[in-house]
């Protein structure tokens, strides 16, 4: 079969010496499988994109294939007819390949008659553009229908080729073997323009029909049009390939119009972003990590003070700006680039606290494989569209040392430690760099803890978070600011954004006061709003500096509180049949109960929000502190409302009424016990040191606040209130100390080497000698002491956790106090056991000290913890036996301590007289588990106030059986 090929070169004279040479960059592309092959073509006919510097004799390819080559010179300068030598001169080709069917015998078309009846068919297209690489191709696949069908033109408009480095333009048309039935093919190229070039050669038309072929029917003409294709990217070679594949049946009209296809260089797109001076990023600071890899190696960041000769990857030039001061990747809508590292949208790369936008949008040039897509030399395939870079899930990841993971299909960038994308985005959304400002380092970390709790994330420690901050906002400096003795580290050059909610949170911290109804039930876990004029004359500075207030970080500490606990109901006020004071009516009694209930609920709310300083404000508000100070400012609206509900005169009268005093005492015990359980729900659970310190500072100031707020209130009410508040403060101090000891001992109990050393030292202790010395005071049975000794050693050897040790101690208390359960002597028996436990443990520590045991420090810490925890257990057992709260039990001892004067010399004589009347007391006591110990009398276990040195009696003796 005959195949005709026409070569038209507008630049050089024809030479018929050599066959066409395929360049090294020829792209072999077999015809589509759907095209039927004639008998003469046994193998698929490859297509070659050739560079024709001089015309050669035409070789006849098999089948009815036509090849049209049109060369458009970029300048009128004549070209050399010699064989092309390797040169950097770039060329641009437009290659059109048309697969058509055989021509009928009745439809012969001569070679000289380029005009024929055209039948245009649908053309599914795909364009892949590579910028600044080796080539840029425009691939258009046209499906030629077997039968003449509807018209589906292809129009590619406004593609211009600049003059830069494009001396010649070739138009190559290849027509492979025809199918069974097809039409004539006509190629029309209109206005192939050159930008800034010599006179245009347009239009260039190559409407060449196929020649006569024996036994082959003629075909109708299929016309493809290319109109004014503009290209504004400086490239080495630009090629357009139009390939037509036959289809079996004619389809409906399919029209695809691509106008204004302009590949944009990265510099031209990102140039609109502002430029910020930042250190360079060198290639040794960037690693390429395959997608899906979870481990990233980190190396030291290079110092910005030393000038490295290595060329930086990203340079700050006027035409290329990769940095943005405080923006995000979302601010750049659809930037186009040829070097993408992921296929799932924009990839922010954080350098010096600003993202480098390196993204490719699929909506700019196409969205599917059947549409026009922007490709690139970043790894995108010729069949993938839209992503440009590596298509699919094989996206890589760039890691800046000490920074974040960039890219990957999941669009995640994580710190080399444990930073989540939400944390990085949170930092960028809430903080910004600025000159002349600073932010406390502790405040920033507290904000981070708040963020972690909201996002259900595991926070890192302060040191790791500091590295995270410096990686996001590079170049930060640290300064120690503040007065002498109260200075703190600050990040200099960092501030909270004006749009950040953290700024409003800090403002609320600086203006802590109640707004509106101070006694109404406030919603839990909400920051208390500020009010105009700080209440009760307490300045903002005094509230924020005098006490460690962590109200701004309330939410990250909520996990350590039991905020779900509500205030129990108070009992009704029992008048006990007494007559109301003069001037007080039943309405005043009811108003006092309602107001006091609201007052206690408000205290619970501020405590749950860790706004400890507001407790003093609430006390002053309820007890009308301002109304008793004539020199103070006019009373606030809240005082006016409270005055309407319960006048201050009636409040003073009720403060002397005994039933009101008893009811107030009961309410305070219930309130303070609930507050203890809210603040410290588990004494062994780790609590942040900041929260512990805030609680201790609050306990230290509690009594002075109350005394100051209740000025001019009757002394009877003041004593009741101070006793309960003192017990509450003492409980908070003890529980925080116990918690601190528990965390210190936890580390010891988890250290295998220390446990082994403690066992070795404990085995050297002469427990027989210890028992002999302690029995004179404790009078404990030998078998009980031996059992406790063995249990202690076994538990220590098993390396049990702190919680297991606590369970063992609780079991010891239960076994020892079991015989006294339900008896009236249970409280004194429990106190006696606590004294014996403490004394016996001190004897063991004494022996370890004398032997210079290596583990003395560990034993001392363990002993302190166990003694304190025993105190905690006994306190709760006694309160349970009495049916009261632990706060109420401790309040009784507080009242007893204030009523006794240990320095009174007259009491010594009375105590000496009492010693002489105690000879009839029995001799022995044994608090053994399961023993036949009788119940203790109410007064039998009272120790003598003074014991003679020569008296051989035990300090504690057993009481006679009660009848």
Curated annotation (Swiss-Prot):
The keyword DNA-binding applies. The keyword NAD does not apply. Keywords: Activator, DNA-binding, Nucleus, Phosphoprotein, Transcription, Transcription regulation. GO terms for molecular function: DNA binding; DNA-binding transcription factor activity; sequence-specific double-stranded DNA binding. The modification Phosphoserine is found at residues 54, 962-963. Residues 373-392 have a biased composition (Gly residues). Residues 1-88, 105-126, 174-218, 361-392, 899-948 are annotated as: Disordered. PROSITE patterns: RFX_DBD. Residues 906-922 have a biased composition (Acidic residues). Its main location: nucleus. Residues 20-41, 75-87 have a biased composition (Pro residues). Residues 42-67, 361-372, 932-947 have a biased composition (Low complexity). Regulatory factor essential for MHC class II genes expression. Binds to the X boxes of MHC class II genes. Belongs to the RFX family. PANTHER family: MHC CLASS II REGULATORY FACTOR RFX1, RFX TRANSCRIPTION FACTOR FAMILY. This is MHC class II regulatory factor RFX1. It comes from Mus musculus. The lineage of its organism: Eukaryota, Metazoa, Chordata, Craniata, Vertebrata. The gene is Rfx1.
